[in-house]
């Protein structure tokens, strides 16, 4: 039975020319299958490669068979021998030597032997190089070196297979769309078709080394097209880290990007890696290889262990630092960040210097009502020596061993320590009038931070002495001046400050109520009842007793101008305690809301009360109130929290540490049941964290803050304007955070949460807002935009816009309400109806923004300043109200208080004339403060470095305004900083910024969103030029500027994401996102267009994005931008477009054809012919068009592309590529033969002949193949070239020593000879037979492998043909 089956199988098997029997299939390649064969004559096994003739024309088939017959003459132990070829009607069969063990690629498969050790790879690669040396000597370039084409015998002998013919098959295939070779092993010049040479095989050898070591070649994790892109784009393929130095150097030699710098195969055979492995092989291949491999692994492991240990030590060091910080942050006092940054670790001298700029915060001893009772005796008893001792230890960073952390003791000592902080900041010259407001907040912050390094004994030194409860000093704050005590004069900031003003406030002490209180207290002191009491309870009872006699309403008294300043503090303390006690969940909703609102007003009047609140109560009670499911309560509590943390980094850190961030974040989401008011309060809280300090920003990010910022990028820009601004500025702050976390990680988090589509939608909205605002403001789109520098004082900045076309940006700001006690009026408009930009993200200018020059206008004139101040003094008494009235009015009236139109307009004009602000792009938050009306006592603009800026000390100026001559000091300080503040007026209090430069971002944002909201007050004056004319125009201009500023920021954000890694870029490559982005190309102005094009260009550098860009019609949208001709950004725009198109079209013929269809060819030719610097992109693109498709070649011819190619023959660098493009165009010419006709012109023929004659030696080898294509594809061109001087040039170069050049020259001479009109004349005139004979007889001495075998064979066959023609 078995014999019958065998017989049956034998009869079914195929035979080839009755000489070979086809057996099993043993492989499959790009152009056919490989079968095992049996030679029926001698029984030898052979390999038979079967190639389909479906797409190969007869002419090319003959060439291929001639090539095989030529290759039969090659004979070397390290190459597979060609035995012949056979042709049937449907297939070409190539007969090859059979190598029994198969390919190395098959052996290293994971299910077989796996990757080889370096030593074994060296053994195999040495033999590969031997084979290549032979092939290259014979003039053959393999072009497809890889593991699958390296075959082995049982004895370990390596043979190179599949050389020479693959190229011919690829060129003959009329449907091919790829370059020759296998993608992952291809050299860059092969991919770019810029001239294949022997060095191309060396690159492939390097790829094969990595393949044998890792089982896969470089870039194998990519698809073929992206892999080709990376091969051309990268400096060199990735080399595994674990390799030895020798093999790494070997690979670097192979991967030289410039083929001329790569060593040849013969040189690489002497490389140390190959030599050392050969010596090791002689002793013991297997043992030596194993030991070496183990040593490498051990060394690598030890290195990794050392790295891990170093990292662990570094990490542990960081942890120690963190733990120390944490331990100090547990102090009960507010200064939890005293040791967290270097700027806080000030020396006494530093503090003294800061003290010279101390503020008016310290007027009236900077009284905190509940602490003022304990303060005065410390004033008398603290000595300079105490101060020096205190700070000496503080500077050394000593910490108490037994620190008492009870809140009561902290309270008890706060005032004393606070006072010491003030003592240290007293200037030496007490008579100087230089007390400015350069650092108003420092007094409070330094005082609060100081105790964190004070020992227990030092704290005891500042404990409350007997008699500390005396109110004598409290009610006589100025009496000490007359006493003239030097010690007290030098340590009392309020005394010196008030004394400078020569204020008559002491007359207020003659008030009857104060007289009665002092008399009562004096009586009690004489009776000894209160002399030793440190408890304020008896004191308050005394006060209340006196007050009952006069039946005074506390609520009405708080802001009653008739009550002297010294009488307000104890009354506010009582009110403060009552309000705080009502902040409990069991209180009614109305009570909680009312208490929160009154506390907000109180904190604005006296910001130092915040210290008391945070120290005694903290944020936890407020967090409990946030659990109440009532919107009014939540909103009111959030307002209170925001007022407390405003511009105070310590309080913000405190709030973060107790877990307030996640709680507030829960109110920031876009849930439908969440009121907009609550959301904007939460947004302001988060904005403060982002913009105050790096530490709070880190805590915000750690609590998953980035997704919250993404959520603020609402689609409805008109409705959520400021929230969108907050998100944009917040993202920039995140990106600017200088920490070990890579920016790419932040990009990935944001991209994962959907920021990219939101950014593009925001970009669209902002662009529309810019366009509409520009149109409405009368801008024609060509007028220059003032982005920084002085504002024109002749043009009013703020006003009411009467047109309705700005509806998109005329909405009230989301974050601009209720933080001044309700809907706040704009600081800059002349109407109290507009809301001010309280939560001002506009002040953020990230470093990523391009810097703009900023300037500040000269300070205001003295007379103008006095006018403003006098105006506000007049209105003081008429507009004061109680806390309750303040809150009710703030909540109930959106148009503010009725004031005369003259009063409204004058402050605005003063601002315009005196201090036109300018933008400051320093990367820091500029600080702009404005006072606008009864609804706001202090503007709330965020500050990144609060300690560098001035703050207002509540309403102490408000109480002392009529007496302190601050205007004089204001003039001396050269600013309006000390202008007194009156809450009913619409005036600008301050325009401050770091180094004197203020940001208009806040002003412009407030104007754009607040002023445009429209109460009609400004427009009520039809005859005023400032009401609806210039003001409306300037509002529109500034609105456009604000939108344009954020438009640029969004474009820069997109650019940041486009620069990120592949994962982030993949989020950008969704179809809808890219389509919307590309649609904006013709909508945006050139600066924004340039940024969007940069994004596209960055995406095009990632091979994984190319397919997505193609599907989104990137090429179709990019090319029209090349039509731009005018403008200073045209070159940059063209650069980005061409670079992106170059990346898209490189290698890929489909995209090249798409670019040609969309009209790129005329643009490319223009760049080339005008010798533009951008021709570096245009030239390769234009040359690639010849390879793309018939349609692209037709367009090339129609636009004169062939003439450009011919002109490029004079360009040394591009000549070879241009010649190859000409050859391709001719080879693919259609039946009309238009390319042939163009090349037959006399000037074209002459250019070709001249180029061959003058071609540089280094390019000579590369031009022979294109010339061979040209003369073999067109016999007419062949004859014309031959009779116009090409023939003698060909024959004269036969003495070239390179075998590849000689072989191609012989092929050219043979082709010319076969079509020459006068062959005998050619033979005789050029003495061709003798030159051929010299080639045949060459090599007598010492050349190995029999010399240039193929050259001799070719010369011999040509000589025989000449002999026949001579005889005939």
UniProtKB/Swiss-Prot annotation:
Changes seen on gene knockout: Pollen lethality in plants lacking both MAP3KE1 and MAP3KE2, associated with plasma membrane irregularities following pollen mitosis I. Smaller plants with shorter roots due to reduced cell elongation in roots and reduced cell expansion in rosette leaves, as well as embryos arrest in the early stages of development.
Domain (Protein kinase) ranges: 20-274
Entry-linked Pfam families: Pkinase (PF00069)
A GO biological process held by the record: regulation of cell division
Biased composition (Polar residues): 488-502, 791-808
PTM entry text: Autophosphorylated.
Catalytic activity: L-seryl-[protein] + ATP = O-phospho-L-seryl-[protein] + ADP + H(+); L-threonyl-[protein] + ATP = O-phospho-L-threonyl-[protein] + ADP + H(+)
Compositionally biased intervals (Acidic residues): 351-364
The EC number(s) this enzyme carries: 2.7.11.1
Gene3D superfamilies in the record: Leucine-rich Repeat Variant, Transferase(Phosphotransferase) domain 1
Tagged with keyword ATP-binding: yes
Its biological purpose: Serine/threonine-protein kinase involved in the spatial and temporal control system organizing cortical activities in mitotic and postmitotic cells. Required for the normal functioning of the plasma membrane in developing pollen. Involved in the regulation of cell expansion, cell elongation, and embryo development.
Subunit organization: Interacts with SGP1.
Name of the featured protein: MAP3K epsilon protein kinase 1
Originating species: Arabidopsis thaliana
């Amino acid at each position: 039975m078995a014999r019958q089956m065998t017989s049956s199988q034998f009869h079914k098997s195929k035979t080839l020319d009755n000489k070979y029997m086809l057996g099993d299939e043993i492989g499959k390649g790009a152009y056919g299958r490989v079968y095992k064969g049996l030679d029926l004559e001698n029984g030898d096994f052979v390999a038979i490669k079967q190639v389909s003739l479906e797409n190969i024309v007869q002419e090319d088939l003959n060439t291929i068979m001639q090539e095989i017959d030529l290759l039969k003459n090659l004979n070397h132990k390290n190459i597979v021998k060609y035995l012949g070829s056979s042709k049937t009607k449907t297939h070409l069969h190539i007969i090859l030597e059979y190598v029994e063990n198969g390919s190395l690629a098959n052996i290293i498969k994971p299910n077989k032997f796996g990757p080889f050790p370096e030593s074994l790879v060296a053994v195999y690669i040495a033999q590969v190089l031997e084979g290549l040396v032979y092939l290259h000597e014979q003039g053959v370039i393999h072009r497809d070196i890889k593991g699958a084409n390296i075959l082995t015998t049982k004895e370990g002998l390596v043979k190179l297979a599949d050389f020479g013919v693959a190229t011919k098959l690829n060129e003959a295939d009329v449907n091919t769309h790829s370059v020759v070779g296998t993608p992952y092993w291809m050299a860059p010049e092969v991919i770019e078709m810029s001239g294949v040479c022997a060095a191309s095989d060396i690159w492939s050898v390097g790829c094969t080394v990595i393949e044998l070591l890792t089982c896969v070649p470089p870039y194998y994790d990519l698809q073929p097209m992206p892999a080709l892109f990376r091969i051309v784009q990268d400096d060199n393929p990735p080399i595994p880290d674990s390799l030895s130095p020798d093999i790494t150097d070997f690979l670097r030699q192979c991967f030289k990007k410039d083929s001329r710098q790569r060593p040849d195969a013969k040189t690489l055979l002497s490389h140390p890696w190959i030599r050392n492995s050969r010596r090791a092989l002689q002793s013991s291949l297997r043992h030596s290889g194993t030991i070496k491999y183990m040593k490498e692994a051990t060394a690598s492991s030890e290195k990794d262990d050392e790295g891990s240990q170093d990292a662990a030590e570094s990490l542990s060091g960081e942890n120690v630092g963190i733990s120390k910080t944490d331990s100090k942050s547990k102090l009960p006092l507010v200064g939890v960040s005293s040791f967290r940054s270097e700027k806080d670790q000030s020396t006494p001298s530093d503090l003294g210097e800061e003290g010279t700029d101390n503020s008016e915060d310290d007027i009236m001893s900077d009284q905190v009502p509940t602490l003022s009772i304990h303060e005065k005796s410390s004033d008398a008893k603290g000595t300079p020596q105490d101060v020096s001792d205190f700070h000496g230890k503080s500077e050394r960073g000593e910490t108490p061993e037994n620190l008492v952390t009870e809140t009561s003791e902290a309270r008890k000592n706060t005032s004393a320590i606070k006072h010491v902080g003030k003592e240290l900041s007293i200037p030496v010259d007490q008579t100087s009038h230089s007390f400015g407001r350069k650092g108003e907040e420092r007094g409070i912050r330094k005082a609060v931070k100081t105790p964190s390094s004070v020992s227990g004994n030092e704290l005891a030194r500042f404990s409350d002495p007997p008699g500390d409860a005396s109110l004598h000093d409290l009610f006589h704050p100025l009496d000490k001046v007359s006493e003239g005590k030097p010690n007290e004069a030098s340590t009392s900031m309020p005394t010196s400050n008030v004394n400078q003003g020569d204020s008559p406030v002491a007359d207020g002490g003659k008030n009857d109520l104060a007289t009665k209180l002092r008399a009562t207290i004096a009586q009690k002191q004489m009776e000894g009842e209160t002399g030793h009491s440190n408890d304020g309870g008896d004191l308050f009872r005394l006060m209340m007793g006196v007050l009952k006699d006069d039946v005074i309403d506390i609520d009405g008294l708080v802001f009653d101008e008739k009550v002297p300043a010294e009488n307000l503090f104890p009354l506010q303390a009582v009110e403060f305690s009552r309000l705080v006690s009502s902040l409990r969940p069991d209180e009614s909703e109305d009570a909680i809301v009312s208490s929160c609102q009154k506390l907000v007003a109180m904190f604005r009047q006296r910001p130092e009360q915040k210290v008391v609140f945070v120290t005694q109560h903290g944020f936890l009670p407020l967090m409990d109130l946030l659990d109440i499911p009532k919107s009014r309560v939540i909103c009111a509590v959030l307002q209170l929290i925001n007022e407390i943390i405003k511009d105070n980094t310590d309080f913000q850190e405190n709030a973060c540490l107790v877990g307030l961030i996640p709680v507030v974040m829960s109110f920031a989401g876009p849930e439908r049941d969440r009121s907009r008011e609550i959301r904007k309060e939460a947004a302001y809280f988060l904005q403060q964290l982002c913009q105050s300090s790096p530490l709070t920003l880190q805590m915000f990010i750690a609590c998953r803050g980035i997704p919250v910022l993404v959520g603020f990028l609402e689609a409805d820009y008109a409705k959520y304007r400021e929230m969108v601004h907050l998100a944009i500025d917040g993202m920039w702050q995140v990106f600017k955070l200088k920490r070990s976390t890579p920016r790419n990680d932040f990009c990935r988090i944001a991209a994962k949460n959907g920021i990219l589509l939101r950014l593009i939608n925001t970009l669209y909205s902002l662009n529309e807002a810019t366009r509409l605002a520009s149109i409405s403001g009368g801008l024609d789109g060509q007028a220059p935009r003032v982005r920084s520098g002085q504002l024109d004082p002749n043009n009013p900045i703020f006003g009411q816009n009467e047109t309705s076309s700005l509806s998109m940006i005329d909405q009230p700001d989301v974050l601009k309400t209720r933080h001044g006690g309700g809907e706040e009026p704009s600081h800059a408009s002349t109407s109290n109806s507009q809301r001010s930009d309280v939560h001002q993200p506009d002040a953020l200018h990230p470093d990523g923004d391009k810097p703009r020059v900023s300037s500040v206008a000269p300070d205001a004139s003295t007379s103008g300043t006095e006018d403003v101040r006098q105006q506000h003094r007049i209105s003081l008494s008429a507009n004061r109200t109680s806390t309750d009235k303040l809150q009710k009015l703030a909540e109930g009236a959106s148009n503010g208080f009725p004031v005369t139109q003259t009063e409204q307009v004058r402050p605005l004009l003063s601002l315009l004339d005196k201090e036109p602000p300018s933008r400051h792009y320093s990367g820091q938050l500029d600080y702009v403060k404005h006072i606008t009306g009864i609804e706001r006592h202090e503007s709330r603009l965020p500050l990144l470095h609060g300690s560098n800026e001035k703050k207002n000390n509540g309403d102490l100026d408000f109480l002392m305004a009529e007496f302190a001559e601050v205007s004089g000091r204001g003039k001396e300080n050269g600013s309006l900083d000390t202008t007194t503040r009156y809450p009913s007026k619409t005036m600008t209090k301050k325009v401050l910024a770091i180094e004197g430069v203020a940001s208009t971002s806040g002003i412009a944002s407030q104007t754009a969103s607040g002023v445009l909201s429209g109460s009609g007050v400004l427009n009520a004056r039809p005859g005023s030029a400032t009401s609806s004319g210039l003001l409306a125009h300037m509002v529109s201009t500034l609105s456009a500027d604000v939108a344009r500023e954020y438009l640029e920021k969004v474009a820069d954000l997109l650019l940041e994401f486009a620069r990120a890694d592949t994962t982030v870029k993949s989020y950008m490559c969704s179809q809808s996102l890219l389509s919307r982005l590309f649609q904006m190309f013709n909508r945006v102005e050139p600066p924004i267009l340039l940024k969007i094009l940069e994004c596209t260009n960055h995406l095009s550098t990632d091979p994984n994005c190319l397919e997505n860009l193609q599907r989104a019609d990137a090429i179709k949208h990019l090319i029209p931008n090349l039509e731009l001709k005018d403008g200073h950004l045209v070159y940059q725009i063209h650069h980005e477009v061409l670079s992106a198109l170059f990346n898209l079209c490189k290698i890929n013929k489909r995209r090249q054809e798409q670019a040609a269809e969309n009209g790129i060819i005329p643009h490319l030719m223009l760049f080339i012919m005008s010798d533009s610097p951008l021709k570096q992109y245009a030239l390769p693109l234009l040359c690639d068009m010849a390879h793309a498709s018939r349609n692209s070649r037709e367009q090339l011819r129609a636009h004169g592309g062939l003439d450009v190619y011919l002109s490029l023959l004079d360009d040394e660098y591009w000549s070879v590529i241009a010649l190859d493009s000409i050859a391709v165009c001719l080879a693919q010419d259609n039946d009309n033969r238009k390319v042939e006709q163009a090349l037959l012109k006399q000037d074209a023929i002459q250019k070709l002949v001249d180029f061959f004659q003058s071609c540089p030696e280094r390019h000579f080898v590369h031009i022979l193949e294109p010339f061979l294509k040209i003369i073999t594809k067109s016999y007419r061109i062949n004859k014309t070239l031959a009779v116009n001087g090409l023939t003698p040039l060909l024959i004269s170069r036969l003495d070239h020593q390179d075998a590849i050049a000689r072989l191609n020259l012989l092929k050219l001479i043979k082709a010319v000879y076969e079509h020459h009109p006068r062959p005998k004349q050619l033979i005789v005139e050029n003495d061709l037979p003798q030159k051929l004979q010299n080639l045949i007889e060459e090599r007598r001495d010492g050349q190995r492998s029999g010399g240039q075998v193929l050259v001799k064979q070719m010369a011999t066959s040509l000589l025989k043909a000449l002999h026949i023609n001579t005889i005939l």
